[in-house]
């Protein structure tokens, strides 16, 4: 469980860093699109983690 928590924190930190890296975001882009795509891929990612 501790490993899953650390992976989750790593994903959150990576997402925040990537979303703040762009100084001028595209005004036409949906700001939640990246986050929602990560949430949709999360079960697929968790299924491929070792130790399950």
From Swiss-Prot:
Proline amide carried by residues: 50
Molecular function, one GO term: toxin activity
Protein localization: Secreted; Target cell membrane
GO CC term (a single one): extracellular region
Proregion residues excised on maturation: 22-33
UniProt keyword annotations, A-Z: Amidation, Membrane, Secreted, Signal, Target cell membrane, Target membrane, Toxin
Tissue: Expressed by the venom gland.
Main location: secreted
Signal peptide: 1-21
The keyword Hydrolase is assigned to this record: no
Disulfide linkage: none
UniProt entry tagged with the keyword Nucleotide-binding: no
Function (record text): Cytotoxin that provokes cell lysis. Induces leak currents in cell membranes in the same way as melittin, suggesting a membrane disrupting mode of action. Also activates DRG neurons. DRG activation and cell lysis is potentiated by phospholipase A2 (PA2). In vivo, intraplantar injection in mice causes spontaneous pain behaviors and paw swelling, which are also potentiated by PA2 coinjection.
Name used for this protein in its record: Xylotoxin(1)-Xa1a
Top-level taxonomy: Eukaryota, Metazoa, Ecdysozoa, Arthropoda, Hexapoda
């Amino acid at each position: 469980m501790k490993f899953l928590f650390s992976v989750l924190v790593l994903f959150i930190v990576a997402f925040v860093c990537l979303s703040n890296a762009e100084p001028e975001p595209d005004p036409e882009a949906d700001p939640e699109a990246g986050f929602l795509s990560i949430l949709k891929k999360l079960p697929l990612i968790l299924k491929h983690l070792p130790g399950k």
